[in-house]
Amino acid sequence: MKYTVTIAMPIYNVAPYVEKSLLSALNQTFVDIEYLLVDDKGTDESMDIVHRIISMHPRGKNVRIIDQKYNQGTAAARNVMVANATGEYLFIMDSDDVISPDCIDILYQKMKQYSVDFIAGSFQRQTWDGDIY
């Protein structure tokens, strides 16, 4: 199936962060999204958390996991994402990032409004307790 947007995320030893990050991606207001996760063979329970979330989330059926044979690092994981994304647009986020529920919708609307091939958004630093700095 061809999607409008692919949200891609590498997974490697991010157990403390991956649930909040993945849920922020899955809970987007934009509908036509493929989720592409690259299992970069970490040694913690990150992938157990990922499998639990996608088994229960309504958008879990839109998640594709690519298993690396062994840990290859962030750059290799990103190359795998680019090579395997089926969306017209690709949004790469790290597995400790959290995006607002309307992030993809806003970025998509701006891309269409200005007829551009690439767009970047701003960010803010925030602790896991919610403090912004």
Q: Could you describe each region identified by the protein language model?
A:
Residues 1-133:
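Nucleotide-sugar donor-binding/catalytic module of glycosyltransferases
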